[in-house]
Amino acid sequence: MKSAYITVVGNLPVSFDMEQTRKLGPVIASANANRSITYDYATVNTETNLQDMLNSANFRGTELLAPEKLFKKYVFFDGVNCLPEFPGLKSYDIDPEKCSPQTLALMLAVYLKQTMVFLVGYDISNPVELTRLKSIAIANPATKFMYICNPPRTYQLDDLENGFCDTFIKFQELIDNA
């Protein structure tokens, strides 16, 4: 049975047992920033990160998704696949080869059509990243986006109908009740 939930692990370090998030559904890593578990998927758009991930035990068994140009160079490596064509990429002004891996991970989560996306360690202090997150959320009203943070709670997503912020405590309760 397909899960309704997916977790996107951003670029920031996370002090949370990420293995627990698997109870909720698939987990997507943003490049090689957090190596705490074996992920279902990882997005990568630089050759250096991809090589590092291919040589890391934590990414064995992880589907590594890269933009087409990078994928073509690594087509014969196990686990390396091409990112899907994301609808509306040009309207978001997002270049898969130049944007952050966490933006790619967010796009992948939306593409996989889960109803709830949990954002853990996701960097919204960068105005470009926050704007892209909000644009993607607005363009996908059927998907809920829950930004997980430590107290105090941030209010940067409160202007979105389908985006909100909550604490790791609430996230842990969700996991425990899964």
Q: PLM features: what roles do these ranges have?
A:
Residues 1-178:
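Metal-ion/cofactor- or nucleotide/acyl-coenzyme-handling active-site neighborhoods
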